[in-house]
Amino acid sequence: MSSTDSVVAGQAKVSTWRKTDTRWVLGLFGTAIGAGVLFFPISAGIGGLLPIIFMLILAFPIAFFCHRALARLCLSGRSISDNITDTVDQHFGHVGGVVITFLYFFAICPLLWIYGVTITNTFIAFWQHQLLLPAINRGVVALAILLVMAFFIYFGKDLMVKVMGYLVFPFITCLVLISLSLIPYWTSDIFTSFDMHSLSLFGSHGILVTVWLGIAIMVFSFNFSPIVSSFVVSKREEYEADFGREYTEQKCAKIISRASVLMVVVVMFFAFSCLFTLSPQDMAQAKQQNIPILSYLANHFSSLGSGKSTYATVLEYGASIIALVAIFKSFFGHYLGTLEGLNGLIIKFGYHGEKSQAPMKKLNMISMVIIMGSTWVIAYINPNILDLIGAMGAPIIAALLCLLPMYAVWRVPALAKYKGKASNYFVTIIGLLTILNIVYQLM
């Protein structure tokens, strides 16, 4: 074979889209599509038609540019097997590694609290509205649910990992089917209630504030950052030795782009379908009741009474069950991350970073008691979930997903080539706006 033929063959090999790339597109997509998506329609729809259109425009840039920035940071590690912790240690030293460990834990733990509140409220709503049973004490409900989940997690973690993996795509399929099944119930109320004269840009209910608060929920809902480090390591091991780091970066960007498109299409279609079925007033009630949109839809169809169709009855019960499964799936995944983060903090400070000296079985039990105990307290207090996302969950995700990579671009020589890019300013603004949600929640 001539050298020209070799080059052509090499280029063909480089341009090939592999099955592993498709698997990672679906993997990133599946990681993001969880219980957080069940709150996005409430936040997006509460302001009516115009804010959700603005969010539709922002959805892909937020999902793509923010995750690409984090992937570029992960790609800057010296070795192809370096994960984000190794890379941060290289760039910012031991202190930086400790800070990231703290951020990692406090980015995931509030999400676990959010899901603890959510699964309690969802079960209570199902108990009262679908099963038509008398009200029960939420403290007892939360404790019982957490004890059952703790039992399954402690004694069957490996089995649960497999089960949760199998549930990802059935959940996505159910989400799409529910979006389609709502079409017969679409109304024109959202358009007839639209009044240009009553719109305002500013104020607590203005378009800008609604979109600003919606950005935090978008960062929370369109988030597959926990898997980005593993994704980058996998792609570096697959491509970098043969094709170089620049090509690997381009391949990662393409995979993230396709995953983001898929995610935005599914989530935004679900959000619009809910908005066309319900009304902004319904969304406000869902926020006040502190339940996910599927639970509210179930209650909505339940209220139709004896005149409802079999189709509506299936939607009523199906929506509640899917919501419970989705929240449990997200709770389990975030529990493992919280456990890892808390164990990491205890080992770092209690055992001077020597994992081999830590009694892991005892440590796991202590961490479980702390995690489940704090989750029960929050679930009993029942803070507003959307406010909790805006005040705690989304801002810390934004610090890791948006601001850390942008700081690294400014500080780290290996990332200097990305300085001055327009997307950097966009990612930084999104990160700052999300973090400023804390200020709004305190006002």
From Swiss-Prot:
Its main location: membrane. One of its GO terms (cellular component) is plasma membrane. It is a multi-pass membrane protein. Keywords: Amino-acid transport, Cell inner membrane, Cell membrane, Membrane, Symport, Transmembrane, Transmembrane helix, Transport. It catalyses: L-threonine(in) + H(+)(in) = L-threonine(out) + H(+)(out); L-serine(in) + H(+)(in) = L-serine(out) + H(+)(out). One of its GO terms (molecular function) is L-serine transmembrane transporter activity. It is found in: Cell inner membrane. The chain crosses the membrane at residues 24-44, 45-65, 95-115, 140-160, 163-183, 207-227, 259-279, 319-339, 363-383, 385-405, 423-443. It comes from the Bacteria. HAMAP family: Thr_Ser_transp_TdcC. Involved in the import of threonine and serine into the cell, with the concomitant import of a proton (symport system). Belongs to the amino acid/polyamine transporter 2 family. SdaC/TdcC subfamily. This is Threonine/serine transporter TdcC. It comes from Edwardsiella tarda.
